[in-house]
Amino acid sequence: TNTSGFKRLVIEKPFGSDLKSAESLNNQIRRSFKEEEIYRIDHYLGKDMVQNIEVLRFANAMFEPLWNNKYISNIQVTSSEVLGVEDRGGYYESSGALKDMVQNHMLQMVALLAMEAPISLNSEDIRAEKVKVLKSLRQLRPQDVRKNFVRGQYDRGVIEGQEVKSYREEDRVAEDSITPTFVSGKLTIDNFRWAGVPFYIRTGKRMKSKTIQVVVEFKEVPMNLYYQTDKLLDSNLLVINIQPNEGVSLHLNAKKNIQGIDTEPVQLLSLIHISEPTR
């Protein structure tokens, strides 16, 4: 009999309910498994366009020199979905949007967008750069949360022609629940590359459409030469569409196809490929 098998442990959230319980769970696991046998995963990192973030950054000479606070005004990360909590009301009551989406999926995308170039594509080297970003996140005081974050909960409504229940009417959800199903807020990274650049995150259920998207908004040009046309120049945008239609678009200003000199925003679009939406 062949006894030279191997063992692997694959874990995804929820990994504990807070730092203390997560550390306790991690210690228990490491008593039974070697570190190289443990795979703590985030399924968002399996999405093609999430993986494409590092390729766009580090395989294209045009982006990396601009990828800093000298040229970028802000970065927006959105993950919205049409679905409600479905049959996960009991789980969602203990997590809410913050634990369900922000502390894992959203922060993983922020880390990929903000990290320094790793010394190699080895998973440990990439992880090391992500950790530096997470350590640079400014800690939020209660007054910061009140000023820079918004939480909400979906109510009854009509989506795609169908009436839908409110969150409090879902199975295994308390009638007076205050669990947020929507979170939007501003994160700040205190390092030389990103000082002063806000990272806006937003995620929610029962939204108008399913969208996972990154928008990089660049700063204005030093001077608007077209001020005599009463035209405010639109910001240059790099838009990374992760789902449902995977692709990259670059929004620039160009001359209108009319006599005289006036500008209009144009969009350079590249569809990487189109796939069916997945959870």
Label the model's feature ranges.
Residues 1-11, 15-271, 275, 279:
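Secretory/organelle targeting and membrane-embedding segments
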